[in-house]
Amino acid sequence: MGSVMSLGCSKRKATNQDVDSESRKRRKICSTNDAENCRFIQDESSWKHPWSLCANRVISVAAVALTNFRFQQDNQESNSSSLSLPSPATSVSRNWKHDVFPSFHGADVRRTFLSHIMESFRRKGIDTFIDNNIERSKSIGPELKEAIKGSKIAIVLLSRKYASSSWCLDELAEIMKCRQMVGQIVMTIFYEVDPTDIKKQTGEFGKAFTKTCRGKPKEQVERWRKALEDVATIAGYHSHSWRNEADMIEKISTDVSNMLNSFTPSRDFDGLVGMRAHMDMLEQLLRLDLDEVRMIGIWGPPGIGKTTIARFLFNQVSDRFQLSAIMVNIKGCYPRPCFDEYSAQLQLQNQMLSQMINHKDIMISHLGVAQERLRDKKVFLVLDEVDQLGQLDALAKETRWFGPGSRIIITTEDLGVLKAHGINHVYKVEYPSNDEAFQIFCMNAFGQKQPHEGFDEIAWEVTCLAGELPLGLKVLGSALRGKSKREWERTLPRLKTSLDGKIGSIIQFSYDVLCDEDKYLFLYIACLFNGESTTKVKELLGKFLDVKQGLHLLAQKSLISFDGERIHMHTLLEQFGRETSRKQFVHHGFTKRQLLVGARGICEVLDDDTTDSRRFIGIHLELSNTEEELNISEKVLERVHDFHFVRIDASFQPERLQLALQDLIYHSPKIRSLNWYGYESLCLPSTFNPEFLVELDMRSSNLRKLWEGTKQLRNLKWMDLSYSSYLKELPNLSTATNLEELKLRNCSSLVELPSSIEKLTSLQILDLENCSSLEKLPAIENATKLRELKLQNCSSLIELPLSIGTATNLKQLNISGCSSLVKLPSSIGDITDLEVFDLSNCSSLVTLPSSIGNLQNLCKLIMRGCSKLEALPININLKSLDTLNLTDCSQLKSFPEISTHISELRLKGTAIKEVPLSIMSWSPLADFQISYFESLMEFPHAFDIITKLHLSKDIQEVPPWVKRMSRLRDLSLNNCNNLVSLPQLSDSLDYIYADNCKSLERLDCCFNNPEIRLYFPKCFKLNQEARDLIMHTCIDAMFPGTQVPACFIHRATSGDSLKIKLKESPLPTTLRFKACIMLVKVNEELMSYDQTPMIVDIVIRDEHNDLKEKIYPSIYPSIYPLLTEHIYTFELDVEEVTSTELVFEFPQLNKRNWKIGECGILQRETRSLRRSSSPDLSPESSRVSSYDHCLRGD
């Protein structure tokens, strides 16, 4: 019986307290230096902001309300345990009586708008309070107050005559009281009324309010007035913004429905056992009250429940973070060793960002993108099943990649990976206690934590045989569920003789109860298709099995699960399936369908010259991670045949073995899936028969061509030859009428596609990215199902086919980097479903056809870097266009009035010299970037809409009217060599970047925004007063300087660390410091303008060398550009300071070329809260006091 019988299984029913107490003793919080040392730490709450209902990340009114509600709740509960779990009885905090309480003035809306929205609520199952049976009086009574308080959401429908009713005003006052006291969510609808009139009680609304207030007590009037002022500031739905009232109602009811879903407690984790103890331990490691970025490892054997714990933790705390994501089964997506490690890491990072920011088709070009996108975001990231350091390097290489307060959770079986990555916060997951194991088993066998009557004894016996492994308990319990006690008793003797507590025996039992067809499906998934989409598996195996029903049954038996569309089988189950397949050959020879998997299993079969000639159905061989040469008999390879599924990665293997393996294709005329990574031959064998082929995946191959002539391809659905850089041509594909995806990315030698492409009537995705030799596309007049066409960086492509207009279902067209493309066909306007059109860096393109005006579903038009583009079509209005980017279209002279719905307009680097008045009607416009031109002052209406201004090189002064740009956030003055001074500028500015302004001497201004960032690289003529102003009035700065200024009384003139002593008086909660560093070159041969950023950490330790903080500068986790004779300053907050001595260290990467020559620290004003909270001092007083403080040297 092995170790199972040593468990000493007890039938005693433990109390919850006993279970938790025992669990705590068995679980460890480990440091990587000593895996048995335990640490216990306290915790607090934090919160998450984004909650998006729309794919384009627009946050709805409902989402904002919900976020505020959650924030209030977090504030109210900040002193409680942040991971404390609700009991079943209290999982819903209140007994709600209604979903929605509407407050409205009946005469205005009851028979029109209100009746329609109530009907929409009814159709969506939203319970709305109706006051038909309440008798009206001068003031609202207890019944109505209870109805308001008992509603999850209050919707205030503000109309012109709303304030004419004292009843409505009393309702509103009560609603706003509930909002303040109990965090009730309040949504607003402004129906034919301006919020300003409500806030200020003006206009027709104000007249009605004045009339209602006559003769009323002053206290009551003030209560009404305060309620109106408050409700007017709540972002809501404006009827004036909607052309169609029905659309507005549908939007409101959908938002309300989605919000109500958040009130429904999750049942996804009901029935999990022992989670309270796991969360208590993890709480000590998470320390959500700290702003440091922390990585936590969850370490334990396979099947112990690491993934379940991580998912549960994610469910508990992820909504307190700005961004969150779970990356599952990472090791399955990252081969070892990796043929192209950089590409694999890039793909992993791409997947992470895609989930994190909800951008399905995100494209990244280098591994620094994650750091750039996430460095200021509070992130909760789970990295599941990590087994290589390279995976962590791709996804979470440094804590500086993420914003303050971020938490990265890594689950792994390998403690060495965590040690190598420097992760010293590790939670070791121990096996559950006897009582917990029994409850886990019972939950899966009986659907409750106790066995059914009469099953007590036998349930305990089976639990003991499961070896306390959660996966085994789950699988075995599911297998016995619903069976009679007699069936259990017949099964038990067999379990006792074959089970020794190992998971393989447990899975064997669950496997044996499957019918033969489901067993085959299980083995197919384990050996070939783990991680594949259900669609592909159904297509590939549908000929042999009832895949749909089989997948459903395997999922019920807990043998597989689904991650969206993809099938997931646990690693242990996969290992069991592969081992079972190998044993079948050993015990049964070729009497069963054979699946050859892994070098060991394949060698056992193929290294014996006596092996009979027999049929095989599938082979999965990964040899790229096998260093020793395999001894496979070539004679055997000649006799094994009839493979339907071939999956091989033989990279780095000897040519002899490569050629021998290719014989498998010769003798397999009915192949359905050929997946061969790094195929070495120049062409597939002439005898290769693709007639039955459904999937062809030959990525990173050495192919020059696939085959000669025309072959029958009627079953082919997926073809991927990406990264086959020597591929010069494709065969005739006219018979591939069912092909859905054709991927040829990075086939850089491919010159043209065959004309037979036009026969691909089922094609949905055509990916030709980086096919730099491709000169033309054939006609695609029959590609009516095409959804994505990717042609970016096809730099030799001269034109698009006229037939592209027949691709009426095309959603995304990317021709960025097609630098030889001169014009677009007029038929482009026939692609009426097009949503994203990217023409960036089409540097030869002169104009767009007027037919582009037909693209009424186009959301994004990106033409950045189209340097020859002279004009856009006129007299068109793309009603769906949201983003228009024309940056660096240097020949564009006319203003692009092609839509009135644009929210993001970028005209930097264009030759535009006017801003038409019509732009004022573009109500959605939120981001408007433009370069300066002399006549800009003639368009004062532009001053209220420009957010980013780029000044030209020849400018001699910044016009004084720039100060009037009330929304200006960014100002760039690069290479303005004649500029001598800066005048007073807009207080709205967040960022000024003045690079290489060689004559700039004075700053005749002050900066009233304490959060402003000022950068003046290579402005060497700046006088001392200007440099002092820059240094002391912003949170981040860069400017010329030869030494750390004397006002930094704590200085180190050599090295990158220094020690400071604080005053002995009581220390505040938070201390603020300004840090200053100056760089020196290590390599004197470097150019003075280094293009590589330098990463700088700030590590703060106390006198005991204990780490207090590890942070980075408040704007950049890296310094750029790197320049000598320049000063870099930035502010930082240090929280919970208890020591009177602090050591500041400035470790940096890129030390080969640069190092920190001098550094300094200046203690600023102290605050009890971080900068995100309300400051103690006004911006102006903060600026002056810190400036004086520095001059005095105190």
From Swiss-Prot:
Alphabetized InterPro entries for the sequence: Apaf_helical, C-JID, Disease_R_plants, Leu-rich_rpt_3, LRR_dom_sf, LRR_R13L4/SHOC2-like, NB-ARC, P-loop_NTPase
Species: Arabidopsis thaliana
Entry keyword annotation includes Repeat: yes
Broad enzyme group: hydrolase
Keywords: ATP-binding, Hydrolase, Leucine-rich repeat, NAD, Nucleotide-binding, Plant defense, Repeat
Pfam families: C-JID, LRR_14, LRR_3, NB-ARC, TIR, WHD_ROQ1
EC number annotated for this UniProt entry: 3.2.2.6
Domain notes from UniProt: The TIR domain mediates NAD(+) hydrolase (NADase) activity. Self-association of TIR domains is required for NADase activity.
Protein task: TIR-NB-LRR receptor-like protein that confers resistance to the pathogen Hyaloperonospora arabidopsis. Probably acts as a NAD(+) hydrolase (NADase): in response to activation, catalyzes cleavage of NAD(+) into ADP-D-ribose (ADPR) and nicotinamide; NAD(+) cleavage triggering a defense system that promotes cell death.
A molecular-function term among this protein's GO annotations: innate immune receptor activity
Biased composition annotated in UniProt, kind: Low complexity: 1171-1185
UniProt induction comment: By infection with Hyaloperonospora arabidopsidis isolate Emco5.
Protein name: Probable disease resistance protein RPP1
GO biological process: defense response; defense response to fungus; innate immune response-activating signaling pathway; positive regulation of plant-type hypersensitive response; response to oomycetes
Catalytic residues (positions): E171
Family indicated by similarity: Belongs to the disease resistance TIR-NB-LRR family.
LRR repeats: 623-647, 658-681, 690-713, 714-737, 739-760, 761-784, 786-807, 808-831, 832-855, 866-878, 879-899, 900-922, 943-965, 966-991
Source taxon at top rank: Eukaryota
Single GO cellular component term: endoplasmic reticulum membrane
Record-annotated TIR domain positions: 96-260
Region annotation Disordered: where it falls in the sequence: 1-27, 1170-1194
PANTHER family linked to this entry: ADP-RIBOSYL CYCLASE_CYCLIC ADP-RIBOSE HYDROLASE-RELATED, LEUCINE-RICH REPEAT-CONTAINING PROTEIN
Annotated binding of NAD(+), by residue: H105, G106, A107, D108, V109, R110
Catalytic activity of the protein: NAD(+) + H2O = ADP-D-ribose + nicotinamide + H(+)
